[in-house]
């Protein structure tokens, strides 16, 4: 079988959730949308459920996958519902929903629910994506709070630039949210991963950690808090061929790398169809049997090439680590002009293996 594999450390996942709880000083919904950022929503939710306050997903399809797998904890639909018929499923499966548009508010007000629903009312405080204007937000709260089909309301907003620690936008959003929500008796939710890791003055009742759960740093530099994150995914493959190139010979499409010395080249079973960044530059580091080696040549659909010249002991079958504890996915993403979110979510055909911890053997493969 092809040797590319992503190893998922479930104990690291639990560690990062506990860190989010500690930094937030509040309840926390573990965000497992997009298949838990490429880590597998069901096994990640199963690992976290004994201690998680709940989960958050993008849409009802993702929530139903968790319910069908036996997850009983609260699940919030971050985009709410797209069709009125989904409200019946929300009630049937005891889901929580965001209300972020006037249409969703009207639908909730008209819905004769068989059980009261828990609704998260979302205000647009400056993201200008989903969310009610401050005026509509207050009007929606007044409209929904007394209805029998509404069990409770949580007031939420989303930070647009919290990953920029020197940007005033986060403070501006927090002030706008506080001014509008002032006097409304309800729990609040404001902090996402960068809000938890980089903005300690922010306070809320519910945090929504996403990227940080998986051990990735949302900032371009390390901080005291991000240094405590543990990478959850380790992406590995193996060398499938070794060849020697003389001076002047190129490697790969477009001859982006030309040997300036006699070069020992390792071909690795990993390409952009697996989710490795296609435009990773020459010199991007990987680990070959624990030794740093530079990527050379253009990344192909199914393969990439590395320079083994300085590590003559490396041969066919050597383990190649593309990201994990080293190299970290965040710096790799920056080097390749993509985001860590994109890399983690992009592993479409790489099989995942789940381990209880980095020091414990494999427990399951999916």
Curated annotation (Swiss-Prot):
Enzyme nomenclature, EC number: 5.1.1.1
Needed co-factor(s): pyridoxal 5'-phosphate
Record SUPFAM superfamilies: Alanine racemase C-terminal domain-like, PLP-binding barrel
Disulfide-bonded cysteines: none
TM segment ranges: none
Keyword Kinase carried by entry: no
Catalysed reaction equations from the record: L-alanine = D-alanine
Protein name as it appears in the record: Alanine racemase
One Pfam family this sequence matches: Ala_racemase_N
Positions bearing N6-(pyridoxal phosphate)lysine: 33
GO biological process: D-alanine biosynthetic process
Keywords attached to this entry: Isomerase, Pyridoxal phosphate
Binding-site list for substrate: 129, 301
Record-level Gene Ontology MF annotations: alanine racemase activity; pyridoxal phosphate binding
Function: Catalyzes the interconversion of L-alanine and D-alanine. May also act on other amino acids.
């Amino acid at each position: 079988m092809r040797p590319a594999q992503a190893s998922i450390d479930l104990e690291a996942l639990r560690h990062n959730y506990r860190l989010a709880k500690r930094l937030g000083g509040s309840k926390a919904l573990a965000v497992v949308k997009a298949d838990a950022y490429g880590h597998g929503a069901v096994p990640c939710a199963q690992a976290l459920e004994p201690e998680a306050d709940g989960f958050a997903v993008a849409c009802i399809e993702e929530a139903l996958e968790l319910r069908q797998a036996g997850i009983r904890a609260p699940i919030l639909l971050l985009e709410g519902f797209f069709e009125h018929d989904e409200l019946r499923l929300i009630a049937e499966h005891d889901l929580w929903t965001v209300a972020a548009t006037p249409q969703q508010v009207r639908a909730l007000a008209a819905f004769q629910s068989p059980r009261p629903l828990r609704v998260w009312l979302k205000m647009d405080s400056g993201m200008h994506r989903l969310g009610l204007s401050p005026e509509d937000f207050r009007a929606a709260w007044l409209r929904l709070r007394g209805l029998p089909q509404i069990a409770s309301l949580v007031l939420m907003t989303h930070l647009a630039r919290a990953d920029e620690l020197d940007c005033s936008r986060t403070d501006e959003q927090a002030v706008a949210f506080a001014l509008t929500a002032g006097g409304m008796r309800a729990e609040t939710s404001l902090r996402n991963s960068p809000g938890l890791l980089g903005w300690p003055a922010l306070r809320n009742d519910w945090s929504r950690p996403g990227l940080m759960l998986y051990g990735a740093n949302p900032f371009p530099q390390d901080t005291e808090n991000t240094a405590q994150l543990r990478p959850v995914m380790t992406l590995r493959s193996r060398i499938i061929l070794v060849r020697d190139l003389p001076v002047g010979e190129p490697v790969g499409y477009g001859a982006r790398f030309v040997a300036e010395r006699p070069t020992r080249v390792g071909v690795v079973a990993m390409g952009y169809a697996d989710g490795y960044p296609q435009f990773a530059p020459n010199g991007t580091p990987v680990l070959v049997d624990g030794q740093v080696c530079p990527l050379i040549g253009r990344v192909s659909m199914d393969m990439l090439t590395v320079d083994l010249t300085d590590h003559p002991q490396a041969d066919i079958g050597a383990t190649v680590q593309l990201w994990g504890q080293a190299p970290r996915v965040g710096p790799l993403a920056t080097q390749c002009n993509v985001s860590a979110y994109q890399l983690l979510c992009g592993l479409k055909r790489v099989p995942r293996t789940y381990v209880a911890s980095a020091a414990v053997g494999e427990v399951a493969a999916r």
